Amino acid sequence: MNAFVTVGSTQFDDLIRAVLKPEFQHCLVKHGINQLIVQYGKGKQAFGDPKSVAGLTILGFDYAPEIESYIHDASIVISHAGAGSILQTLRSGKRLLVVPNESLMDNHQVELATKLASMNYLVTCSTSNLVEGLEELYPKILTPFPKSDCSTFQKVMQDVAR
């Protein structure tokens, strides 16, 4: 089983560093994850030459023309809080842990992640409590995101914009 991490097109080195920490890797292995795939975007230096714990392989890349296949193949997705990445993952039916990039000036990401978490579609956490976020995600029964119905997402976006 694998976990897929995406930072989208913005730089999010804190998330990259957090998923590469041994305590987070051990938590992944504990939950049956044996491969961590990281889309690190502009954060190649933060990704570096990662050291993995026993039982876990780490792969990384900067960008791909599409990430749908990575999401499809993943057991869980750990994502920045960009609307496109969230929607794509929710539509795939995958377990989603969202980590807003708190360094962004207009922090709509926190609002979006918080709203969708309150609706039980995903779990959200910060880079400083990523292990706790993963531990919350695993036993949690999430509400499936409605298929082909953009009204729920539009409502969330309207609520966030207020």
UniProtKB/Swiss-Prot annotation:
Top-rank taxon: Eukaryota
Family: Belongs to the glycosyltransferase 28 family.
Enzyme class, spelled out: transferase
An MF annotation (GO) of this entry: N-acetylglucosaminyldiphosphodolichol N-acetylglucosaminyltransferase activity
The protein, known as: UDP-N-acetylglucosamine transferase subunit alg13
InterPro entries given in the database record: Alg13-like, Glyco_trans_28_C
Pfam families, per the entry: Glyco_tran_28_C (PF04101)
Gene3D superfamilies: Glycogen Phosphorylase B
Record's keyword annotation contains Transferase: yes
One GO location term (cellular component): cytoplasmic side of endoplasmic reticulum membrane
Species, as recorded: Schizosaccharomyces pombe (strain 972 / ATCC 24843) (Fission yeast)
Keywords recorded for this protein, A-Z: Endoplasmic reticulum, Glycosyltransferase, Transferase
Example GO BP: dolichol-linked oligosaccharide biosynthetic process
Assembly and interaction partners: Heterodimer with alg14 to form a functional enzyme.
PANTHER family the UniProt entry points to: GLYCOSYL TRANSFERASE-RELATED, N-ACETYLGLUCOSAMINYLDIPHOSPHODOLICHOL N-ACETYLGLUCOSAMINYLTRANSFERASE
Transmembrane domains' residue ranges: none
Key word rRNA-binding present: no
The protein's role, per its UniProt record: Involved in protein N-glycosylation. Essential for the second step of the dolichol-linked oligosaccharide pathway.
Subcellular localization, as worded in the UniProt entry: Endoplasmic reticulum
EC code(s) of this entry: 2.4.1.141
Reaction equations catalysed: an N-acetyl-alpha-D-glucosaminyl-diphospho-di-trans,poly-cis-dolichol + UDP-N-acetyl-alpha-D-glucosamine = an N,N'-diacetylchitobiosyl-diphospho-di-trans,poly-cis-dolichol + UDP + H(+)
